[in-house]
UniProtKB/Swiss-Prot annotation:
InterPro entries xrefs: D-isomer_2-hydroxyacid_DH, D-isomer_2_OHA_DH_cat_dom, D-isomer_DH_CS, D-isomer_DH_NAD-bd, Glyo/OHPyrv_Rdtase_B, NAD(P)-bd_dom_sf
Family: Belongs to the D-isomer specific 2-hydroxyacid dehydrogenase family. GhrB subfamily.
Species lineage: Bacteria, Pseudomonadati, Pseudomonadota, Gammaproteobacteria, Enterobacterales
Enzyme kind, highest EC tier: oxidoreductase
Key word Repeat present: no
The protein's name: Glyoxylate/hydroxypyruvate reductase B
């Protein structure tokens, strides 16, 4: 008898067919409510979004594996999963290059004021030659500081170094030999990163250690001409402090793909600022990469429920 699983995100037909080969699938339009009858027999879940905590696990007594179609897993209570012996799988490798592209897009859009200037053109403000009121700042040869040198940080460093001749600084728990050898990247402490970076690029996940890592004190240490880019998690940055810094000119601008609350509320003060480029968490949102992420998540669930996990496991200790 095939294991029962819940699919709570639309995926391509061929990937759905692959799930059907291995499992009895209940497909839902959204994350299952706690009283959904399918939870009682589900051995696996696959999708993105939704809060998996102790309460959820109590309503899913047979759950053995969760496969998220994402690299981030901050909506999962990993300790609770470990306690119940539930395997958590994610998709850390397939989205690296696409998210790094998004970082560069945010850097360019913020520095050259692309969104702001395009809106002015649409509003009929382009009457003739442009003066300094329309100018932006260069990206090439500026210093990029990368906070978190994982896969995405490394891909950003590659683009910055080879594409824009940018000196690369980074802050991470340990030295990254490849970044230092290939891109002449320099490991430094956080204060140095803040003080010397023209672009501060945050690629960190959200943990208890990274929550509000960048706050009012840290923003005050940045250059007035600096631009902050965040494609990690929203709560790594204190949004109130960031808003204040952008209003006061403590820093020049921000390019943001992630926020504390998503979707970003329409009354967020960040949306009123011309020096903010705000995206709807689309760092990996290309047709190609989203397909690859779903395919990876399907393979992950099959591996987890067949006892053949070799990679992409968040909590490998439960495999022992």
């Amino acid at each position: 008898m095939k294991p029962s699983v819940i699919l709570y995100k639309k995926i391509a037909d061929d990937l759905r067919a692959r799930l059907d080969q291995h499992f009895t699938v209940t497909e839902l339009d959204a994350f299952p409510s706690l009283d959904h009858p399918a939870l009682a027999t589900a051995e696996g879940i696959i999708g993105s979004g939704g809060k998996v905590d102790k309460d959820f696990l109590q309503h899913a007594p047979r759950l053995r594996a969760a496969s998220t179609i994402s690299v981030g897993y901050d909506t999962f209570n990993v300790d609770a999963l470990n306690e119940k012996g539930v395997i958590l799988m994610h998709t850390p490798t397939v989205l690296t290059e696409t998210v790094a592209d998004t970082v560069l897009a945010l850097m360019l859009a913020s520095a050259r004021r692309v969104v702001e200037v395009a809106e002015r053109v649409k509003a009929g403000e382009w009457k003739g030659g442009v003066d300094s009121d329309w100018f932006g700042t260069d990206v090439h040869h500026k210093t990029i500081g990368i906070l978190g040198m994982g896969r995405i940080g490394l891909a950003v460093a590659q683009r910055a170094h080879f594409g824009f001749s940018m000196p690369v600084l980074y802050n991470a728990r340990r030295h990254h030999a490849e970044a230092e050898q290939r891109f002449n990247a320099r490991h430094c402490d956080l204060d140095t990163l803040l003080a010397e970076s023209d672009f501060l690029c945050i690629t960190l996940p959200l943990t208890t250690e990274t929550h509000h890592l960048i706050g009012r004190e840290q923003l005050a240490k940045m250059k007035p001409s600096a631009i902050l880019i965040n494609i990690g998690r929203g709560a790594v940055v204190d949004e109130d402090a960031l808003t204040e810094a952008l209003v006061k000119g403590t820093i020049q601008g921000a390019g943001l793909d992630v926020f504390v609350k998503e979707p970003l509320p329409v009354d967020s003060p960040l949306l009123d600022l011309p020096n903010v480029v705000a995206l709807p968490h689309i760092g990996s949102a290309t047709h190609e990469t989203r397909y690859d992420m779903a395919a990876c998540a399907v393979d992950n669930l099959i591996a987890a429920l067949s006892g053949e996990v070799k990679e992409n496991c968040v909590n490998p200790q439960v495999l022992k």
